[in-house]
Amino acid sequence: MLITKKDVEYTARKRIEKLYDFAIRTGDRRYIIEMEHIAQRMDITLPANIKRGYCKKCKTPYRNQVVRIKKNLVTVKCPVCDDIRRFQISR
């Protein structure tokens, strides 16, 4: 049985989702770092909900963050490194 590229990508995506779940549950950075490493190695774009679920600067998953909403902009502040990220939303 041959392993196709789709099979490998499917397995990588499932592993990324599982690592993200572990990161959210435990609050551990190493799962986020491993998840990014897999996505980069397999040339996979992370889904938007995963991309927005952790701090890009310190790689800590958002758990108890400060969220502000103004018009069509959501501002999230990381509780660890105080980095601020802004996301556009449509209403």
UniProtKB/Swiss-Prot annotation:
Q: Which GO terms describe its cellular component?
A: cytoplasm; ribonuclease P complex
The record's comment on protein family reads:
Belongs to the eukaryotic/archaeal RNase P protein component 4 family.
Q: Which organism is it from?
A: Thermoplasma acidophilum (strain ATCC 25905 / DSM 1728 / JCM 9062 / NBRC 15155 / AMRC-C165)
User: So where does Zn(2+) get bound?
Assistant: C55, C58, C78, C81
Its needed co-factors are:
Zn(2+)
Could you list this entry's UniProt keywords, alphabetically sorted.
Answer: Cytoplasm, Endonuclease, Hydrolase, Metal-binding, Nuclease, tRNA processing, Zinc
InterPro entries registered for this protein in UniProt: RNP4
Q: What does this protein do?
A: Part of ribonuclease P, a protein complex that generates mature tRNA molecules by cleaving their 5'-ends.
Q: Where in the cell is it found?
A: Cytoplasm
What Gene Ontology terms describe what this protein does at the molecular function level? ribonuclease P activity; zinc ion binding
GO BP of this protein: tRNA 5'-leader removal
Cofactor comment text:
Binds 1 zinc ion per subunit.
Q: What is the lineage of its organism?
A: Archaea, Methanobacteriati, Thermoplasmatota, Thermoplasmata, Thermoplasmatales
**What is the annotated quaternary arrangement, including any partners?**
Consists of a catalytic RNA component and at least 4-5 protein subunits.
Q: Which domain of life is it from?
A: Archaea
Name the reaction it catalyses. Answer: Endonucleolytic cleavage of RNA, removing 5'-extranucleotides from tRNA precursor
Q: Quote the protein name from its UniProt record.
A: Ribonuclease P protein component 4
Enzyme Commission number(s): 3.1.26.5
